């Protein structure tokens, strides 16, 4: 009997496979990092072949370490870094170029041009997104214009576009032999190419980027009536298992946090931070710099929408302290170092490495460390880095409250940085509300498992999922309103220093 569901979480810095039981408890996992390719200033790439090799390895290893086989799995769910753009040949299976990662800013001039001639307003209305380097449409246009042979092959139906979910599912289902080219509504809603009302590729939006429709995958529900496809005997699982769930990573975290009612919200702390608010079946367009996006679609039901505040650089700022500055040797050391000081010593770090996302959407911004004096140490910079994560989240919370008219009383959190207890305390202090972490912090992988399990009847309904959610830790504010306001004012001043950092 199949008593487990597997989940593939293809993230920005690593790929992991996790296996869950009926209670939503992790019974096994394996995780591998992949290389971050930085060929030029502002460019961020991944090797698609390396991503697929990592996916194969973590899936196979997760089964081996748990002593399970394909027959023990009821379904597989996939979740992924959104917006990251891949193009490959359907006959050879080879990518035409490296994947252009969501953080990449090479398309800044494409994005700026969309706003100058009025196309940006149409994109906002139809796709719910502002023209920005973040989203897939401009990245795909760049590949079509700059990589030899792609446009010709795309027009002939030989070149396939996809976000990482499409690439992983295509390979899992047989690749050049029998690969299924598909995506779900949540990933498609991050491209600037899908109409939020029709849930289909929009011809007018495609024309803005000169994208041939035939290279795009069909769009399906996140938890479809029929599986996307099946793994193969020759694949990493060694047998046929239905692939029955597909969600962009932040939408998967919403499902994993069981934020299934309008008004429920979560904040995921990963490479970036992503705060989503469930708005139900209502399409809510933001007046405060947030995105309108598909939250999920289960079966034949209507889609559920969300408002999202996307922050480009949070966890990757800690990674920068490790990899570029060398002041820590591991991410966990950021907490120990930051605890050596009581405050930031007047230092603010605005990590606008990819410009500023919500609520500013300023691709001209660049990172800055301000307020330095000879008094300051590495510990102050580590503290300022953790504060930057939390101040950026506060800006998004304020925008969300303004759009929804609802005061946030509790913030559900998940993701790797929630292991940093000091960072979570700073978050409670900067917001002035309780911050709550569930027992299963890896809610992205859990959400993909839930979507797949619901599709095949492994879990009956949303109530089954709610029964699985349990609180693990809670942080409450420990500072005065006056001190909270003073710190935030310093942050806002620092942000202004980052603007107009480059010409676009």
UniProtKB/Swiss-Prot annotation:
Q: What is its EC number?
A: 2.7.1.30
Residues annotated as binding sn-glycerol 3-phosphate are 12, 82-83, 134, 249
- Positions that bind ATP: 12-14, 271, 315, 319, 416
Q: What is this protein called?
A: Glycerol kinase
Q: Which domain of life is it from?
A: Bacteria
Binding residue positions for glycerol: 82-83, 134, 249-250
| One Pfam family per UniProt | FGGY_C
Function of the molecule? Key enzyme in the regulation of glycerol uptake and metabolism. Catalyzes the phosphorylation of glycerol to yield sn-glycerol 3-phosphate.
| Residues reported in the UniProt entry to bind ADP | 12, 16, 271, 315, 416, 420
Q: Which organism is it from?
A: Mycobacteroides abscessus (strain ATCC 19977 / DSM 44196 / CCUG 20993 / CIP 104536 / JCM 13569 / NCTC 13031 / TMC 1543 / L948)
| Ways its activity is controlled | Inhibited by fructose 1,6-bisphosphate (FBP).
| Swiss-Prot/TrEMBL keywords | ATP-binding, Glycerol metabolism, Kinase, Nucleotide-binding, Transferase
Q: Family per UniProt?
A: Belongs to the FGGY kinase family.
Q: Which reaction(s) are listed as its catalytic activity?
A: glycerol + ATP = sn-glycerol 3-phosphate + ADP + H(+)
The transmembrane residues are: none
Look up keyword Transmembrane helix and say if it applies: no
Which pathway, per its entry? Polyol metabolism; glycerol degradation via glycerol kinase pathway; sn-glycerol 3-phosphate from glycerol: step 1/1
The beginning of the lineage is: Bacteria, Bacillati, Actinomycetota, Actinomycetes, Mycobacteriales
Sorted alphabetically, the Gene Ontology cellular component annotations on this record are:
cytosol
What GO terms in the biological process aspect are recorded for it? glycerol catabolic process; glycerol metabolic process; glycerol-3-phosphate metabolic process
Give the Gene Ontology MF terms in alphabetical order. Answer: ATP binding; glycerol kinase activity
Q: Which InterPro entries match?
A: ATPase_NBD, Carb_kinase_FGGY, Carb_kinase_FGGY_CS, FGGY_C, FGGY_N, Glycerol_kin
């Amino acid at each position: 009997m199949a008593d487990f569901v597997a989940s593939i979480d293809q993230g920005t810095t690593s790929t992991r496979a996790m296996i869950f039981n009926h209670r939503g408890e992790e019974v096994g996992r394996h995780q591998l990092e992949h290389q971050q390719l930085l060929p030029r200033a502002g460019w961020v790439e991944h090797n698609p072949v390396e991503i697929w090799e990592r996916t194969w390895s973590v899936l196979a290893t997760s089964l081996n370490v748990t002593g399970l086989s394909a027959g023990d799995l009821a379904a597989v769910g996939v979740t992924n870094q959104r917006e990251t753009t891949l193009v490959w040949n359907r006959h050879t299976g080879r990518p035409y170029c490296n994947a252009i990662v969501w953080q990449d800013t090479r398309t800044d001039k494409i994005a700026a041009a969309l706003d100058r001639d009025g196309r940006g307003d149409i994109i906002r209305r139809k796709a719910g997104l502002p023209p920005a380097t973040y989203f897939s449409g401009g990245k795909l246009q760049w590949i079509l214009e700059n990589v030899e042979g792609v446009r010709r092959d795309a027009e002939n139906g030989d070149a396939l576009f996809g976000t990482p979910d499409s690439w992983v599912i295509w390979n899992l289902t047989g690749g050049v032999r029998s690969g299924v080219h598909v995506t779900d509504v949540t990933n498609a809603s991050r491209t600037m190419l899908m109409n939020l009302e029709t849930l289909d590729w929009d011809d007018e939006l495609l024309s803005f980027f000169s994208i041939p429709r035939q290279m795009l995958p069909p769009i399906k529900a996140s938890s479809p009536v029929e599986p996307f496809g099946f793994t193969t005997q020759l694949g990493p699982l060694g047998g046929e298992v239905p692939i029955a769930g597909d969600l962009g990573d932040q939408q998967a975290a919403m499902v994993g946090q069981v934020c299934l009612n309008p008004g429920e919200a979560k904040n995921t702390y990963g490479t970036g931070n992503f705060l989503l608010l469930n708005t139900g079946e209502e399409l809510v367009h933001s007046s405060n710099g947030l995105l309108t996006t598909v939250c999920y679609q289960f079966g034949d039901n209507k889609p559920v929408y969300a408002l999202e505040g996307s922050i480009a650089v949070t966890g990757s700022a800690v990674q920068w302290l490790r990899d570029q500055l060398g002041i820590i040797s591991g991410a966990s050391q950021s907490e120990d170092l930051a605890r050596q000081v009581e405050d930031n010593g007047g230092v603010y770090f605005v990590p606008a490495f990819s410009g500023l996302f919500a609520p500013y959407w300023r691709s001209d911004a660049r990172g800055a460390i301000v307020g330095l004096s000879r008094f300051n140490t590495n510990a102050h910079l580590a503290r300022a880095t953790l504060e930057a994560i939390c101040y950026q989240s506060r800006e998004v919370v304020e925008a969300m409250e303004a759009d929804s008219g609802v005061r946030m009383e509790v913030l559900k959190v998940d993701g790797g940085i929630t292991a940093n207890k000091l960072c979570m305390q700073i978050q409670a202090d900067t917001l002035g509300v309780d911050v709550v972490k569930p027992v299963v912090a890896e809610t992205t992988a859990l959400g993909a498992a839930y979507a797949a399990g619901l599709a095949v009847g492994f879990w009956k309904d949303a109530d089954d999922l709610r029964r699985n959610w349990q609180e693990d830790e809670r942080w409450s504010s420990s500072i005065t309103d006056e001190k909270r306001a003073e710190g935030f004012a310093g942050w806002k001043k620092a942000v202004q220093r980052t603007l107009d950092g480059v010409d676009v």
